[in-house]
From Swiss-Prot:
Matching Gene3D superfamilies: Pancreatic trypsin inhibitor Kunitz domain
Location of this chain's protein in the cell: Secreted; Nematocyst
GO MF assignments: potassium channel regulator activity; serine-type endopeptidase inhibitor activity; toxin activity
InterPro entries, per database record: Kunitz_BPTI, Kunitz_BPTI_sf, Prtase_inh_Kunz-CS, TFPI/VKTCI-like
Name of the protein: U-actitoxin-Avd3l
């Protein structure tokens, strides 16, 4: 019973969010420090991080506005700096 409750709570939070936004933050395998934004599904905000320049995943946006638009975040919920 508890499992089902947890499942539905998690499903409700992620329903309708672009699947790329649910990927974990990934700085990539290179060592550059490009400022980027990713959607943090725990805080439900777009947050800043430093991208290494290669590799990584699709949860990687050039601007806060792009992250918010793709991931459906309201501006008042962001930004959160890392």
């Amino acid at each position: 019973m508890v499992f089902l409750l947890c499942f539905f709570l998690v499903a409700d939070v992620s329903y309708g969010i672009n699947k790329d936004c649910l990927l974990p933050m990934d700085v990539g395998r290179c060592r550059a420090r490009f400022p980027r934004y990713y959607y943090n599904s725990s805080s439900r905000r777009c947050e800043k991080f430093n991208y290494g320049g290669c590799g990584g995943n699709a949860n990687n946006f050039h601007t806060l506005e792009e992250c918010e638009k793709v991931c459906g975040v309201r501006s008042r919920d962001s930004p959160k700096e890392n």
